[in-house]
Structures are given as C-alpha cells and as structure tokens.
C-alpha cells in the first residue's frame, strides 16, 4: 500500500488529478459541499453512498440499495477494474461507507484509490511533522 499525504489551506493548493470514479457521501456541512464541488470536472462518474445499517446495504445515488455482500459485483458493473482511478471523498462519507468500499476495492485488486478529506479550519495539529 502506498500512502501519500498532502496538506493545504484550500483545494487549489493541492495537486490536481483526474479520476474515473468518485464516491461521495450525502453531507450537508459546508466542508462536505466544498469537497464535493472540488471534484467537479475531475471525475467521469460520481456516485453518492449512504450506509443503511438496518438493511446492511449501501443506498446508491439516493435511488437503490446494494447489499454489502453485493458491492463488488456492483462496482464491476459500473466498470471498475484494477486499473481504474478512484477517489473516496472522505469528508462526507462515513466510516461504514469507507470501510465497505475499501474492502470491495481491495477484493477487486484496485490499486489507484485516493482519498480526499477536508479538515475543519479550526483544527490545529500539535505535531505537524508527525502523521
């Protein structure tokens, strides 16, 4: 696994890439909205994801459920392969969504998975040199 971290006070300070697929949460905070808007124009296919604990499923694009055991098949039907470039917008996604997606992407041998997270502006790191 290769982990590369970038820091900036705004999205414009970060390296720009193009992705084939993005997975976003259904967030309503300004940080969520800003992070999702930052992906516009950089992604070919964007899907919103919300974990439904009572059904043990992901609600996709606020339209249909995909059971957690069927997520790999769903991703393959989207066209995701081991060579796909994928970004998870982790500001708006919850832990359950991230975990289910990461497990399915790992099982599909996807190597090009990035994560975007916008921390609240008032966060102050005590040790900025330690990750």
Regions of interest found by a model, annotated:
Residues 87-92:
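Short N-terminal targeting/anchoring amphipathic segment
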